Each structure stands twice: as structure tokens, then as C-alpha cells.
């Protein structure tokens, strides 16, 4: 009985350890800018149909790759754990 409790406790700690490693590694990956494929339209300035299309494709890639929110303005596309609304 004691060995079963010990094994279960060990499994819990090991799973927590790996969850922390995965969370930390993905949080570092998630804050970096993603490489935007050349097929995406890179536009500057105010929101237009082209920049809205770019941000839509950017956010789709961001969620597909990291499951993170996206900050997109003009030609800047960044996946992060939070969205900075600094308008």
C-alpha cells in the first residue's frame, strides 16, 4: 500500500514538473515574433483591406502554432501571452 502511494505521488510530481517545463518553454516561444511567410501582405499605415487580410492570416498562424493571442498592427505580427492595446 505504501509503495502504491509513493508511486502515485511520484507520478504527480513528475507530471507537474513536465507541465511547468512545457509552460515555461511555450511562454518564451510565444512572446517571440513569428516568421511571417512571404505570401502574407506586409503593409504599413492605417487599417486597409490589405492590412486586415494580413492580420487575419497572422492571427490564424499564431493560434495554429502557439495557441496564443496575437498583436497585429500594420506589418507587425507578434504572438504573446497577452495583447497590448497601446493605441
UniProtKB/Swiss-Prot annotation:
GO cellular component labels: extracellular region
Source taxon at top rank: Eukaryota
Transmembrane annotation, as ranges: none
Signal peptide span: 1-34
S-S bonds: 55-72, 58-77, 62-79
Family membership: Belongs to the DEFL family.
Annotated protein name in UniProt: Defensin-like protein 223
Lineage summary: Eukaryota, Viridiplantae, Streptophyta, Embryophyta, Tracheophyta
Amino acid at each position: 500500500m505504501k509503495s502504491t502511494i509513493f508511486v502515485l505521488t511520484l507520478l504527480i510530481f513528475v507530471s507537474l514538473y513536465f507541465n511547468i517545463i512545457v509552460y515555461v518553454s511555450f511562454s518564451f516561444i510565444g512572446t517571440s515574433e513569428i516568421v511571417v511567410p512571404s505570401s502574407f501582405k506586409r503593409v504599413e499605415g492605417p487599417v486597409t483591406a490589405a492590412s486586415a487580410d494580413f492580420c487575419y492570416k497572422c492571427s490564424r498562424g499564431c493560434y495554429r502554432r502557439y495557441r496564443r493571442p496575437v498583436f497585429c498592427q500594420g506589418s507587425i505580427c507578434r504572438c504573446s501571452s497577452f495583447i497590448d492595446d497601446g493605441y
